[in-house]
Amino acid sequence: MKDKAYDITIIGGGPIGLFAAFYAGLRGVTVKIIESLSELGGQPAILYPEKMIYDIPAYPSLTGAELTENLIKQLSRFEDRTTICLKEEVLTFDKVKGGFSIRTNKAEHFSKAIIIACGNGAFAPRTLGLESEENFADHNLFYNVHQLDQFAGQKVVICGGGDSAVDWALALEDIAESVTVVHRRDAFRAHEHSVELLKASTVNLLTPYVPKALKGIGNLAEKLVIQKVKEDEVLELELDSLIVSFGFSTSNKNLKNWNLDYKRSSITVSPLFQTSQEGIFAIGDAAAYKGKVDLIATGFGEAPTAVNQAINYIYPDRDNRVVHSTSLID
């Protein structure tokens, strides 16, 4: 059965893709979002759901989870004209009569126009690289923190020395029974002020040590074996939960198959966010142009222009004058 052709398909369900979908709904067109992850929200939802964000207009501060929740709630107004496809990776798209054929790892989709809002691409956590690590993952070994309360009263070990590792350690200090940070260097890569707070806290710091083995029963890790760098000293740390904060690697590996002009991992666009292929637009971190500032707020501003240009492309004979939302929603 042939999939119906949507007006606009948005590749990427992060903050910019979600707002673009909302604005497209506001303009009265049908929208499909294709997201490679198992949930919407992109990096704010997955990587820093409980960290504060300070550069979203009209919000003095809010967490990544709150930002995602607000965007999904905003989009729900147009759920009757919005379709969401999760855990689908866009492999290729081709120009066909009436629009584009979009092939993913699961299906073939059809769209009259495309807006690419996939950020820097798919991302995956950098792991410890230890045997049996995968067995414990998502049970009591975590690569990102969704809820701080889940660690209440626990012995928590954090591996890493960057901003995320230090921030989580400080955030968990008053929640967990104990917090231990293991880092391979004596110096931390985090912001100086955060490091000062860490050193003045009750968090246990073990440097320079590297993880060597995990011990546990079933799917639960019980001990992390660490070794001092360039020495034979070995320690076994008892734990209830282990947080691995080595960062994430990103990849736009399929970009080369999309037949678009790009630089590094971003797509070259015009001032109207048109890519090198007519009918395909790019916004957010996926888009590259002179003077680009990679902020969520920037992407929010790019979304309406891209949506309006997509509508002009699809319906060139329609009266496409932009109307303020106060005139469209009661």
Curated annotation (Swiss-Prot):
Keywords: FAD, Flavoprotein, NADP, Oxidoreductase. FAD binds at residues 35, 43, 48, 90, 123, 285, 326. InterPro entries: FAD/NAD-bd_sf, FAD/NAD-binding_dom, Fd--NADP_Rdtase_type_2, Ferredoxin-NADP_redctase_2. SUPFAM superfamilies: FAD/NAD(P)-binding domain (SSF51905). GO terms for molecular function: ferredoxin-NADP+ reductase activity; flavin adenine dinucleotide binding; NADP binding. Signal peptide: none annotated. Binds 1 FAD per subunit. It holds the Pfam family Pyr_redox_2. Its EC number is 1.18.1.2. The keyword Flavoprotein applies. It catalyses: 2 reduced [2Fe-2S]-[ferredoxin] + NADP(+) + H(+) = 2 oxidized [2Fe-2S]-[ferredoxin] + NADPH. Belongs to the ferredoxin--NADP reductase type 2 family. Homodimer. HAMAP family: FENR2. This is Ferredoxin--NADP reductase. The lineage of its organism: Bacteria, Bacillati, Bacillota, Bacilli, Lactobacillales.
